[in-house]
A protein has these predicted regions:
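GST-like domain detector, emphasizing the conserved glutathione-binding G-site
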Residues: 1-137, 152
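Short, conserved loop/turn and helix-capping segments at secondary-structure boundaries
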Residues: 38, 87-91, 212-219, 225
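Short beta-strand(s) of the beta-wing in winged-helix/HTH DNA-binding folds
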Residues: 54-57, 182, 232
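Acidic/polar loop patches that form or flank catalytic/metal-binding clefts of enzymes
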Residues: 83, 232-234
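GST-like fold's C-terminal all-alpha helical module
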Residues: 103-223
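A late-sequence structural motif
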Residues: 228-229
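Carbohydrate-binding/catalytic loop surfaces
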Residues: 239-242
Length: 242
């Protein structure tokens, strides 16, 4: 059986849970406490040197990490229902969408981390913070922890992050003029990749933008996504829930 090391609120973890649910793949769940730094322990880093979640342990014991890599592997090995277009050009378009969304994760962190990690990080002494940061393999995440602990994002920075996320909705709106889904005529990994972002935009960051008035095609897409059985199974719940 697969083992998934993940977090309920982690955007990347949500992507993989959505893919697993769409495929009907059962797995053993292991929750990682990001605020406690469990993903930076020597044991975890031995499995995933990037020190991020999710981490998927295959039935044969091998490890996979990075959500887009995991999801493509799952679609390769469990091809039904297909979550990648059959046409090579459309598959390339799908990967472009996933890459585009990945590049905007920093804008989401501005809002997501203040709900948990920032509250823990702010209470650390300078020595404790230095020790915590020392264990983080990514310089980008080291800087994010330092910001969360000692220099919270300003209203201006939040405004800029919000603006960039709304631009993502604009791009979606334009793409959806050709059909119900982002790429081709089927729900794909492109849609799965962006679901965690739209969820957060809708519930807190810019809910007035995910409406029939502002982005009607995105609004219809979002209703269709939430109606899929896999959405409930993947537990994409409000961020403010424990």
């Amino acid at each position: 059986m697969f083992m998934l090391y993940h977090g309920w609120k982690s955007s990347a973890s949500r992507r993989v849970r959505l893919c697993l649910a769409e495929k009907g793949i059962k797995y053993e769940s292991h929750i990682i406490d990001l605020a406690r730094g469990e993903h930076h322990s020597p044991e975890y880093l031995a499995r995933n040197p990037n020190g991020v979640i999710p981490l998927l342990i295959l039935p044969d014991g091998r490890s996979l990490y990075e959500s887009s890599t995991i999801n493509e592997y799952l679609d390769e090995t469990y091809p039904e229902p297909p979550l990648r277009p059959g046409d090579p050009y459309l598959r390339a378009e799908m990967r472009n969408w996933v890459r585009y969304v990945d590049e905007r994760i920093g804008n989401l962190i501005v809002f997501n981390w203040k709900h948990g990690i920032a509250q823990v990080a702010a209470k650390l002494s300078d020595a404790e913070l230095a020790e915590r940061i020392r264990k983080i393999p990514s310089k980008e995440r080291q800087e994010a922890w330092m910001r969360a602990a000692r220099k919270p994002y300003t209203p201006e920075e939040e405004g800029e992050a919000r603006r960039k996320l709304v631009l993502m909705l604009d791009k979606m709106e334009a793409s959806l003029k050709d059909g119900d889904w982002l790429v081709g005529d089927r729900y794909s990994l492109a849609d799965i990749g962006i679901v965690p972002f739209v969820k957060r935009i809708d519930e807190e960051i810019a809910p007035d933008e995910v409406t029939a008035g502002k982005h009607p095609r995105v609004f219809a897409w979002w209703q269709a996504v939430q109606a899929r059985p896999a959405f409930a199974e993947a537990r994409i719940r409000p961020f403010t829930e424990p």
